[in-house]
Structures are given as structure tokens and as C-alpha cells.
Amino acid sequence: MWQFIRSRILTVIIFIGAAHGLLVVGPKFIRANQEYTLVISNFNSQLSKVDLLLKLEGETDNGLSVLNVTKMVDVRRNMNRMINFNMPEELTAGNYKITIDGQRGFSFHKEAELVYLSKSISGLIQVDKPVFKPGDTVNFRVILLDTELKPPARVKSVYVTIRDPQRNVIRKWSTAKLYAGVFESDLQIVPTPMLGVWNISVEVEGEELVSKTFEVKEYVLSTFDVQVMPSVIPLEEHQAVNLTIEANYHFGKPVQGVAKVELYLDDDKLNQKKELTVYGKGQVELRFDNFAMDADQQDVRVKVSFIEQYTNRTVVKQSQITVYRYAYRVELIKESPQFRPGLPFKCALQFTHHDGTPAKGITGKVEVSDVGFETTTTSDNDGLIKLELQPSEGTEQLGINFNAVDGFFFYEDVNKVETVTDAYIKLELKSPIKRNKLMRFMVTCTERMTFFVYYVMSKGNIIDAGFMRPNKQTKYLLQLNATEKMIPKAKILIATVAGRTVVYDYADLDFQELRNNFDLSIDEQEIKPGRQIELSMSGRPGAYVGLAAYDKALLLFNKNHDLFWEDIGQVFDGFHAINENEFDIFHSLGLFARTLDDILFDSANEKTGRNALQSGKPIGKLVSYRTNFQESWLWKNVSIGRSGSRKLIEVVPDTTTSWYLTGFSIDPVYGLGIIKKPIQFTTVQPFYIVENLPYSIKRGEAVVLQFTLFNNLGAEYIADVTLYNVANQTEFVGRPDTDLSYTKSVSVPPKVGVPISFLIKARKLGEMAVRVKASIMLGHETDALEKVIRVMPESLAQPKMDTSFFCFDDYKNQTFPFNLDINKKADNGSKKIEFRLNPNLLTMVIKNLDNLLAVPTGCGEQNMVKFVPNILVLDYLYATGSKEQHLIDKATNLLRQGYQNQMRYRQTDGSFGVWEKSGSSVFLTAFVATSMQTASKYMNDIDAAMVEKALDWLASKQHSSGRFDETGKVWHKDMQGGLRNGVALTSYVLTALLENDIAKVKHAVVIQNGMNYLSNQLAFINNPYDLSIATYAMMLNGHTMKKEALDKLIDMSISDNNKKERYWGTTNQIETTAYALLSFVMAEKYLDGIPVMNWLVNQRYVTGSFPRTQDTFVGLKALTKLAEKISPSRNDYTVQLKYKKNTKYFNINSEQIDVQNFLEIPEDTKKLEINVGGIGFGLLEVIYQFDLNLVNFEHRFKLDLEKQNTGSDYELRLRVCANYIPELTDSQSNMALIEVTLPSGYVVDRNPISEQTTVNPIQNMEIRYGGTSVVLYYYKMGTERNCFTVTAYRRFKVALKRPAYVVVYDYYNTNLNAIKVYEVDKQNVCEICEEEDCPAECKK
């Protein structure tokens, strides 16, 4: 069945001469590379044919001709003639017109201006999710379409840019190649990105075509959703809002919990709040207190916080609820927008309730001005009061007024129509619309028709036309084939002559389908998690198909990330949308019409409602553990097979939820196809487990692991639930130590979440697998899942590394002794010892590029450790001709992530700052700019103009003396402090300019002035740190005093002949020694650099990095430069590792560059001996670690902790105060960090810090490790007290809690620190265990 809706009739009045009848109709718009069709109809009864000259021409604004096409045509009597013009591909913007001239004695001349449409392509963007967490990967597709929704043949690539919330370019693809009109790629979001709304934009030929946003934020995907709606439509007279609250898991089952409801009235002030227990659905009434409305409707705000039972997971919903003064509204439904004087005018008052249902029984008085109409009446069962009014010939306006007995009032004016005829023609659909099927239309006219003309328009052109002769009938059955050319939308126009008037009607055809009839279906609507699902696709053979599936819960954030049927309709309408024009109806159809001089087109008005044409749419077993909990999946491209179909089998994730599956297809000939709406299916089990596990616990603590069981089988069953002791990592409290599993039984009624818990202790540090299985009905229904929680040490881990570097130019044999420095107070069982042989200096750096520093990196300078080492590694790999493409790819990818991270700290003036929006820093801008310039060799995302702007800003900060001083805050005193005449910072800035080829030329004067300043200061430089950077700057500049500076620097060095090491003793000795090594390399003193390298490699961390950012940056740079000169191609040696009475052998040749590891060294080993014999070079490393109780640290900060009384067992408020203890009066630390770790079971929310002191404000805050740690950053600390309060909440039950700690330290000198432990509630096992878990001592 299909429904008819009355269509409006368009009447064109044409004054016709006695012997003339000609109509020319054509599109009003032209586009490049598109067909243009003109239709000429001859209804001249005297001439058997007319001859015409058609001329299509165009010129630019300055008169240059861009189009000139002519055609001679003849049109026979009572016939149509369709004339096609093919527009050239290179058609450009200009002034276009078509001219029609009569020939061979036929007098006719008409012109029509045509509008050039430049938009010939459009774009769409699809993203796999609307919101992303830090560290996620963004998958996206760009789709380009032409006016026929096909891949544009002339566009081969696009320019794609991704920008962060500050509009910094994070990634760009300058020539993103299209396949079937699609470009697909991804972006790895870094773990510490700029949070907010990001943007993907697509450009073609320099113009933006389409863009889309997505959000990056910290979030937890809710397992359930809450809906809040009025139980009844609220009215002022009710003085209350009645709400229905529904809470359901995404897989459809009800949620049990507590709903906290808050009502806000005028000025958004809290009016009242209530709490109610809800199981799936609940209702609550919130009564007003004398609520008075100023208008017919007013919004109030309702906030509902729903807290799930057992887990405390919370969903917050806010709703605007409209309160109405009256229970109904009214609308005037008119036969036509205007009335005709002297003819009956039918209309009706339509009364509806605010939920859309008819409002019957509404009584009131109806009055109509100017016609003397007045009556009291009541709305019928359809909510209608029907009126038939009789306007006279002199009536100009009808004023329709309604007054109800309850005070409701309505008024509307209706104007008369300006017309000279009562004739009209009507087009009605008599059949469904189906592709390649006949459509039947009934054409009805008030006059007998000798002929009528029909036109079919689609995609901006006339695709069909016909001249019909109904033999003087008033009705005619028109049959047209629904061709593919009409899809997806078309218009049909009919016209005839009635007396001296041409009347016409038109209708819209919406096929609700596309030429590429793509279809997608799945074999099951409900499936168990982790099982296979079969997708069936059909469409055009060989067509591209893009698939995506995502968790329905993501739609709570946004749904604009995906592609929907409505998006395609908007793209199509964007090409072909026409502005309505009541004075030119042909223009409203995208056409123009021209006829003879004595025929006049008058404005047309509607006489009846329109018919909207309806579309043709028809009305004991092996248990697998669930470990895959993706939020989006099935991001896949496939092709339709030759048969026009394709099947695909995929494994669904292990999440129990509802999924949305979407798909589209593109064919070069038939264009785009997309499914009408996403396919929704549910992953659910008849019986399943939901976990609520903590992020981390400490070894030895007694922890309650909480699970919830769900049973959808309709009857109550006894469930056996087993927790496994995987790899002997777990101890079951109150059970024998040898138990490998623990099984409990619990009764599980249907459709109710039943909690069950296990009390355990973790035996080992690291990751602990939590594996649980539950079964009912003797194992016929089972579920099992496995997740990992982190087991943290009770003490603080102390990593150590001893190294020795050897470089043998000829065959040698040497023994290297290693004595392990393990603290006597180290915790028992915490020692780990490893030997590592590294034939390549940078191998470990490459392996650990994504995790070089364990310390926080939450400011603009520290963050560079995620960027700079990748540049150095790439420099090394390319310099040594490495064939390790996977290493190059890894470093390049991490380089992009580091760049993405760093753009958070770019300031509006082009410089860089230590914090977001904190102001500029000379030091950091120099550091970043030179690094990005170097990085641009390996990634094209870096904007050269951005680097140039930073260097320009830098150059503008030079003092007239040539010196540079820091403009921003000082957090690295030796570099920025301005002490010792600012030599260090001036040298640092000069190195940045000298290492940039463009800046070196552009700012040559700045460099020269700076070098003059340094050379004048050289004799007075007595600090090794200052001299090392100044010497390196002189080396880069090729300054005449570079040798003098290097000799002076060497004189300041310290040599250790026993270890064959050289270094410079100062507060920044790693950085100083690294700059010295860079100068050695530039002076080609490679052999002299070996002892310096020996010392540097002994300062490295396990990861291959150095303790801090600048150490790592300069240290790796220096080692890289020397390593490029020393090739491992001659390596050929044997290494003997001796410990206790054991010996282990390693043989190394030039083919081996990977690290050799040996882990099986007993923890009681105190001494190792390593012998190397052969030729070549390598690095010997002994890595060891032990845990040390937190009380064994010396303090250089004063740190005080105070637990505040909250009155709740579930809330922790900790007051933290710290200040620096100076050795000299008024001295201060460098950048200082305070890290607060929380006791097991406690986590913070998004804004945990309050009551902070403002004398020395907190600059940045990071929440780490799943909310179990908070890091605060200060520019520096002095003797002032720096205090704040951190608030955390207990989410999990833990007994025998280990103490937590707070640590404060100087980032650039970690020897300056303080650490304090604190404890919260001292619960014992008996207080948190359930009866069957409790050990024997609890039962006494």
C-alpha cells in the first residue's frame, strides 16, 4: 500500500497569438563535463515545422570567449525535439546564455541567461568512532563523488589534513591517491595528546571540499544507557513533572541501581532532588512550588545520575523538559495557500496534543473576518474543525480567529490569489515506483486536452520528454518506464493549453534507492560474543565495499562519524538544490521557459494541495576465554564477486553489547550504494559474566575480585564459578597455598545480576592474569573471560645498569669485571640480573623508542624525548645505509606521534612554551624549531612556514649585544637562568639557527652578532657546561676561535685512566660531556672521542636513553654522530660471561646487530667477569634491579601529608604540602614534580585537585595508570609552601593494604627529592571477606 498526499498545482498563464504555439524548455544551470538538453515543443497548428538556430555561448568577466556552440534544428508540428549539448571538461566560471533564433521566415528570437555551477564533486568522510582515547588509532575513509554519485574520473588524488584543537597540522597526505573514489588511512593518537575536537579536512585543487570532526578525550564506555522522558505531557496546571526513567544494558537487559534526580527551574537553580531504586524502569514525580509561566511553554532541566548496583558505574543524563500552558496546539490546514475570490475556500483547524495525537473535543468560537462567518463548534475525532468559506469577488483577505473556552487563542490571515483563469491540470500517481517497471499516472484537466507535454528532469538535466495527444479528453492515463537514469530522484512536469492559458503540474519522484543497489545482511541478529558471524553482500560485480562496525554505546557521544543514507541524499541535493521562486516556477524546477513574443508567462499560484509520489520500497564443550573487548571492528574493504555477491565470515568481539554494522559500495559506472540504515545486532549469551576489576593492586594485599552473573534462560539455576590460579600468580585467601583453582556455587535467578567475589592476594609483580569460568546446567551453558590487572611492588623499584664499551682496531683480548651495587636493605626476592651484549650502540634505543624515559613527560620540554630520538635514529639508519625497513618505519611512525604531541605546546605567536597556553620560551623554541627542521627530512607533515615563524620569533629576541635572554619562566637554571652572562642560552640558540640551512642564510646577521658576543666572552667562561655549548656553536659556525675553545674545554675535563674514560664534572655533566663529544666529532678527533663515549654509555638507562630530556637529546646525538663514523661491519669476536662457577659464550660477526640477552643469572650473584677476544666494537651491559623500602631515601624537599576527615569510608582526601630545602639562601629548584600514588582500590575522577595554593601555581596535571596516580608540575620550588588537596574514591575492596606514597623531585636533578608514605583505613581480611572466603581466624 502507498499513501497519497495532495500535490500543489502550478499554473502558467501564456497569452497565445492566433497562429502561434512554441515552447522552449531547458535547464537553468550548466556544469563542466555534463550533458545539457533542450526541449522544443511545436503546437503551432499552421506550420508543419519550424526551423531554429540554437547558440550556446559564454565569456569571462573580461570578455574572453570560453564557449561557442551552434546547432540548426527543425521541429515538426505536434512534436517535441530534444537537442543535446556536451559541455567541455575544462568549462570555467563565466557569463553564459542560450539564444534561439527562427530561420527561413519564422520570426522568433529569445535569450536565456544560464547559471554556471562550479560544484561538480562532493566529498564524505567516515571515521570508525566518534570519540577516541589517548593512544587509540583513528581509522578514516574519504569518499569523492561527482554529480551522478560516481567516482569523479578526472580527480586522481586529494589533499588530506588532520589538525588538533589548536588548528596545528598533525598529519597530512599531500597526494592521497583514490581507489574507486576512496582514500583510506589512519592516525595513531599519542598517549598524551591535546584533548578536544580534532578535524579532518579534504582539499581538491586548493579548495576545501569536506571536513569532519572527532573528539579525543579520556572516557569509559558505559555498558548501559539511561533514558529519561515525561510519563505524561507536563502542563502548568499539573504543577509537577512526572518522569519515567529506563536503564538498560546495551544488549537489552534491565539494569538495577539508584537514580538520583535533580530538578532545575528558573535561572537554572536547583529546585529539588529525589532518589529512587530502579530495576530497568521506574517513575518519579517532582512537584513544583507555585510555578508560573510567562509564555505558552517553558523548559525546565532535569539531571538524572544513575548508579549501577554492585559496581558503582554511573551514567549521567540531562534533559530539557517542556512544560506547556495548554494541552494542545492548533494549525490551519488549507486547501491551497491562498483563496480565489468568488470561489469556495476549504480549510480546517487541526488540533493536536503535544505528543502528536489528535486533540478531540476542543470547543470554541470560530470567527472569520470579511465574510461574516461565526460559529461555536468542537473538534472531531481526528482533531479537526472543518470550514468551507465563501469569499466574495471583492474579498481581499480572510482573518481566521479561534477562541477556546479555556482561554486558548489562535489567529491567521489568508490572502487572495492573483490569477485570470480557473483552469488547472493535475498529476496523480496510480502505481508504486519500482526500478525498470511502468509507472502509471492519471493526468486530469478541467478543460478537454488536445495535447499535453511531459518532461522528466534528474540530476540537473532533462532526461526524457514526450508530446501526448489525449483526443480532447479531460483524463488520460500516462505510463512511463522508471529508468535507472531517474534514480535516485527525479521530477515530472506536465503542461497543456486550456483556452488561452498554459497550465501545468509537477511532481517529485524519490526512488529511495541508488543505481548501485548494494545490499548487506547478516545471518543472525543475536549471537554469542567471540563467535563467527556471516555477512552477505550483493551489488555490482567488482564494486568496492567499505565495512565498519562499532559499539552502540559510542552513539551516546555522537553519531556524525559514520555514513548514513541521509548523508547521500544531502550530497545529491547539494548538487541539484534549487531555490524556490514564487515568481518563476520554472526556475524553481531548475528550468527556464521561452515562447513567442505575444505569449506571456504570468506568476502561478497553488489551487490544490500536492501529491507527493511514494517510493517503491516494500512494506560440553571446549571453553574459550573472552579477551577481545574492542569498541569498533570490521574496518575492512572487500570487492563484490563476479556473480554480484560476496560472503564474509568474521569473529565478533567478546563484549556483551549491541553493535551497529554499516556498509557502502562504489562502482565506477553505477556509483555509490549504501544500506538504508545500520544493521543492529546483539552479542549476548544465555548465561554470562561481567567483570569489575581494579586497574592495579599491590603484591601481598588481600583484594576482592568482583564479578556479576546474568541468566537469560527463564528459570533459576545453580552456577559453578571457578577462578583459576594462572601460573601460580595468585593466592586464595583462606585456602591452601597449593590450590590451582577455587570454585564457588551461587543461585542465579533469571534476568537479575547476581554478584559473586573472590578474595585473593597477588604473589608476583607484573601482569597477573585473572581467568574465571562459570557454568550452569551441568556445563551445558558456560562463559569464561580473561583479563589482566597490574601487580605493583610494595616498595620502589631501583633499576641499575653497569656498562663497558670496547673498540678493537686489531685483534685483542680483554677482561671486564662487574661488581653489582645492590643495597643491603633490598627486599628479599626482588633482585633481577641480566647480561646484555650490544654490537650496535643504538640498537636498544631503537627497540625502546616508544618508552625511553620512565619519568613523566608532561611539559613541552620533557615531551621532546618522544620526538628527538627518532630523528637521531633515522639519521643513523640512513647514514649507515641500513636495510632494516621495519626499523625505519617504526622510527618514522613514532616521529609523527612525537610531532603530534609537541604541537600542543605551540603558542599563538609561533613560538613554543613549556605548557599549553603558558607563554613563550626562547630555550624551548630553539630546541623545538631545530628539531622539527631536521625531522622534516623524514616526514612531510611538518609545515616549513611554522618552523620559519618559530625561528623568526627567536631571532627577534636577540639583545643588541648579540646575547639571548629567556623571556619565559625559568625551569632549567643552568640553561635559562641568565647566570654567567647568558652564554649557555646564547650558544644554544645559535646552534639552532646554524643547524637550519634556511635560517643560517636568513638570519646570518643574527648569527654573526651572537658569535661576536661568544668570542668576546670566551676568555671569561669558566663553567664547563657553558663552554661545551659555546664550543659546539663555534664548531658549527667554523669560527676562527673554535680550536682555542676546544683546547680550553679539554683542559677542564676529568680523565679516569683505569676505565679509559673522559668526562666533565658539573651539575649537568651528561649534557656537558655530550656537547664536548659533538665538538670532538666535528673536529674529526674520533679516537680522542672514544674515552668520552666510554663515559657516556656508562650513564645510560636500561632503555638506552639518559636520565632526562636534554641529557637524552644531546647524549644520543653525540653517540649517533660518532657511531656513524664507527661501522660494525668488521665485528668478529667471542664473549665469555663468567658468574659463580658458570660460563656462557657469545659469538659475534658483522651480520649480527641484534642484542644478545642472557637472563638466567641467579639473584644472589654479586660479581660477573666478561672476557672479549677478537676485533670490532660493542657494548657490554649488566642490568639489575631490586626493590627498596620507601623509607630509605634522603630528603632535599620538605614534604607533609595530612589525611582529612570526609565522613565516608569510600572517599579519601589527602592534603599535600611541599617546599624546597635550599643549600643557599633564596635558591630554588628546577622544574619540580609531585607524584601522588593512591592506595589499592582507590582511583581519582577527572578533576581530583582542589584547594591549591596560588603563590606558585600548579602548571599541569596528569592522571596516570588508570586513575591510580596523579602528577603535578611546578615551574620551580623555593621555600614557599606549595599545597593542594587530592580527592580519590574507593571502587574496590582491599585488605592488608600496603602503604602508598607521595614523591617530590627536581626534574633536572633527581638527587634532589623527598618521599613519604601514608596509609588509609587498615581493614583486615575478616572485614571484607564473604563467609566462605574467610580464613579460620575470622570464624572464632
From Swiss-Prot:
Transmembrane segments: none annotated. There is a cross-link at residues 859-862 (Isoglutamyl cysteine thioester (Cys-Gln)). This is Thioester-containing protein 1 allele S1. GO terms for molecular function: endopeptidase inhibitor activity. Disulfide bonds join 1217-1283, 1326-1338, 1329-1334. One of its GO terms (cellular component) is extracellular space. Keywords: Disulfide bond, Glycoprotein, Immunity, Secreted, Signal, Thioester bond. Its main location: secreted. Residues 1-21 form the signal peptide. Residues 580-609 are annotated as: May contain the cleavage site. SUPFAM superfamilies: Alpha-macroglobulin receptor domain, Terpenoid cyclases/Protein prenyltransferases. GO terms for biological process: immune system process; positive regulation of opsonization; positive regulation of phagocytosis, engulfment. In the hemolymph, the full-length protein is cleaved by an unknow protease into a 75kDa N-terminal (TEP1-N) chain and an 80kDa C-terminal (TEP1-C) chain which remain non-covalently linked. The TEP1-C chain contains the thioester bond which covalently binds to the pathogen surface. Cleavage is induced by bacterial infection or aseptic wound injury. During embryonic and pupal development, the cleaved form is the predominant form. It is found in: Secreted. The gene is TEP1.
